[in-house]
């Protein structure tokens, strides 16, 4: 059975902000009926990790202006395509917009926050790796949105950086649909790390 040391483990919550998870303001929303249950499961996970002295780092997508988003050719094309899940992406998480706010139930004053994520990568052009190394991490527990893109990308990159990767299976979801969400979990299990539910994570941490 997998064993995790809380002294060298860090939770990374990716894009768990209102821009995905608050149907009232979300610009790239998870289906509304999935938001509440996911937030509840993620809140239970993060609270349990904090109780076990595991640091929590939030990574938040944030853009200065729409031009930063439109610099990506696929995203620019998807913005006006009604058949794309990412339609309207040029309005997503502009600096100062309510979408950039971390979901209140998931944030604690003790948590650390990395802002300014610009693409699917949580590592590219951010100080996430620096922060993880400073915290003494050899293991990351990944939670967040979307399983199919940003979480998957973080799992690949963390693996390439030789972190042990655990995917918090109860605290990830995708606006790309259930089939793609489950496919991403299977891919990560096959090649990148350990998808575990909340209780299995707590057991691996020794409690």
State what each model feature region is.
Residues 19, 62, 146-148:
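Short glycine-rich anion-binding loops that position phosphate/pyrophosphate groups of nucleotides
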Residues 20-21, 175:
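Catalytic P-loop NTPase motifs of RecA-like helicase/translocase cores
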Residues 23-30, 71-72, 158:
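Surface-exposed, active-site-proximal loop segments in enzymatic domains
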Residues 61-79:
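A basic- and aromatic-enriched beta-loop-alpha substructure that forms the phosphate/nucleotide-
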């Amino acid at each position: 059975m997998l064993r995790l040391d809380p002294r060298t483990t860090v939770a990374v919550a990716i894009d768990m902000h209102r821009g995905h998870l608050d149907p009232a303001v979300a610009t790239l929303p998870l289906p509304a009926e999935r938001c509440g249950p996911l937030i509840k499961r993620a809140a239970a996970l993060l609270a349990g990790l904090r109780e076990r002295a595991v640091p929590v780092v939030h990574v938040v997508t944030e853009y200065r202006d729409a031009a930063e988003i439109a610099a990506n050719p696929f995203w620019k094309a998807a913005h006006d395509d009604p058949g794309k899940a990412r339609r309207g992406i040029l309005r997503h998480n502009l600096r100062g917009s309510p979408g950039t706010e971390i979901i209140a139930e998931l944030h604690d004053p003790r948590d650390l926050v990395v802002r300014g994520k610009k693409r699917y990568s949580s590592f590219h052009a951010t100080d996430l790796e620096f922060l993880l190394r400073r915290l003494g991490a050899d293991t990351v527990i990944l939670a967040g949105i979307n399983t199919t893109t940003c979480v998957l990308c973080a799992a690949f990159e963390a693996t390439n950086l030789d972190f042990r990767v655990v995917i918090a299976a109860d605290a990830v979801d995708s606006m790309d649909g259930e089939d793609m969400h489950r496919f991403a979990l299977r891919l990560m299990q096959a090649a990148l790390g350990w998808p575990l539910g909340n209780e299995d994570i707590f057991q691996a941490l020794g409690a």
